[in-house]
Design a protein with these regions (language model features):
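Phosphate-coordination loops involved in phosphoryl transfer and adenosine-cofactor binding
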Residues: 1-3, 79, 127, 142-144, ...
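Rossmann-like nucleotide/phosphate-binding core characteristic of flavoprotein oxidoreductases
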Residues: 1-7, 19-25, 215-219, 225-231, ...
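Beta1-alpha1 glycine-rich phosphate/pyrophosphate-binding loop at the start
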Residues: 2-74, 144, 156-182, 252
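Redox-cofactor binding/interface segments in oxidoreductases and associated redox assembly factors
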Residues: 7, 108-109, 148, 234
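Residue-level detector of alpha-helix initiation sites
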Residues: 10-11, 112-114, 153-154, 279
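A Rossmann-like FAD-binding core segment of flavoenzymes
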Residues: 66-96, 100-103, 164-261, 301-305
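Glycine/small-residue-rich loop that forms an oxyanion/phosphate-binding "nest" at active or ligand-binding sites
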Residues: 76-142, 151
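FAD-site-proximal beta/loop scaffold in flavoenzymes
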Residues: 113, 118, 124-140, 236-283, ...
């Protein structure tokens, strides 16, 4: 029986793991991989203490920190997928791809995952020119014309990455104004190989064996237009990874875990959540880490009081 099971190893899970080890709680951290969503970022400039760090380097630093913190109280298992969490009397059962674990408390730091395109051609050309990971697939389209769907920070960061080796990058966004930070927008749009199409809707994706183009609707003119591209990189938002606790704790209308912002407690005693899987107003790496530490401090007191 564990005192605590931490699910996820992004900034939140990693921070909680370090603090749990220091408090000598019998803890196991379960994760599919390290790093969270930021693992795909080429240049992270707002992780405190690092003026610039890549997503892969950040993920590796998380892993190394946990390895350093590990002792006889903290266990880490990578490559494990959590399927379901259920209440079992005065404790919880965590069913995973690597077996079932019993614990007195659970901290969910699973973050969120990419929302997929839902237009004609999106399923047909998934992994055939449509990608949700520029770091993984971008180099395959060096010297090609490509498109990015989404006008948030993730969309512009993806465009910046692709501009390093693609012939041209066209970014399509559904609103007249962008959600990304202004400094990021200005920097990316200043590149001569960068094109932007705000206030448009993606209509469909065309191709034969692979993507050859897309059709979009220009809201200003009311006309549909075609754009020839050989790849489409989608950055259209995220879906919280909370399937394992559906029916166990309260979720909001969008599937995020509702928590008490003072303690990060979920609706069921013994369950805490932190980071992008929660209904917190802001989702950032540094916030996820802070929220997870807050949760850890609270659950430590909870355990000691029992």
């Amino acid at each position: 029986m564990y005192d605590l099971i931490i699910v996820g190893a992004g900034p939140g899970g990693t921070a909680a793991g370090v603090y749990a080890a220091r408090k000598r709680l019998k803890t196991i951290l379960l994760t599919a991989e390290f790093g969270g969503q930021s693992v795909v970022s080429e240049d992270i400039q707002n992780w405190i203490g690092f003026p610039s760090i890549s997503g892969t380097a950040l993920a590796e630093s998380f892993k190394k920190h946990l390895e350093t913190a590990k002792g006889d109280s903290l266990e880490v298992r990578e490559g494990v997928y959590v399927n379901k969490i259920t209440q079992n009397g005065d404790h919880f059962s965590v069913e995973t791809s690597g077996g079932t674990f019993e614990t007195r408390t659970v901290l969910i730091t699973t973050g969120s995952h990419r929302r997929k395109l839902e237009v004609p051609g999106a399923k047909e050309f998934d992994n055939k020119g449509i990608s949700y990971c520029a770091s993984c697939d971008g180099p395959l389209f060096a010297g090609k014309d490509v498109a990015v769907i989404g006008g948030g920070n993730a969309g512009f960061e993806t465009a910046a990455q692709l501009l390093a080796y693609c012939k041209s990058v066209t970014l399509l966004h559904k609103n007249p104004t962008y959600k990304a930070d202004e400094i990021t927008v200005q920097k990316v749009l200043a590149n001569e190989h960068m094109h932007a199409l705000p206030n448009v809707d993606l209509v469909s994706i065309q191709g034969d064996k692979f993507v050859s183009g897309l059709t979009y609707h220009d809201k200003a003119t009311g006309k549909e237009k075609q754009l020839a591209v050989e790849a489409i990189f989608a950055e259209i938002g995220n879906i919280p990874t909370t399937e394992m606790v559906k029916g166990l704790v309260n979720l909001n209308d969008f599937g995020y875990i509702t928590v008490d912002p003072k303690t990060q407690r979920a609706s069921l005693p013994g369950i805490w959540a932190a980071g992008d899987c929660t209904d917190g107003l802001y989702h950032q790496n540094n916030i996820a880490a802070g929220d997870a530490v807050k949760a850890l401090e609270d659950l430590y007191l909870y355990l000691k009081a029992k």
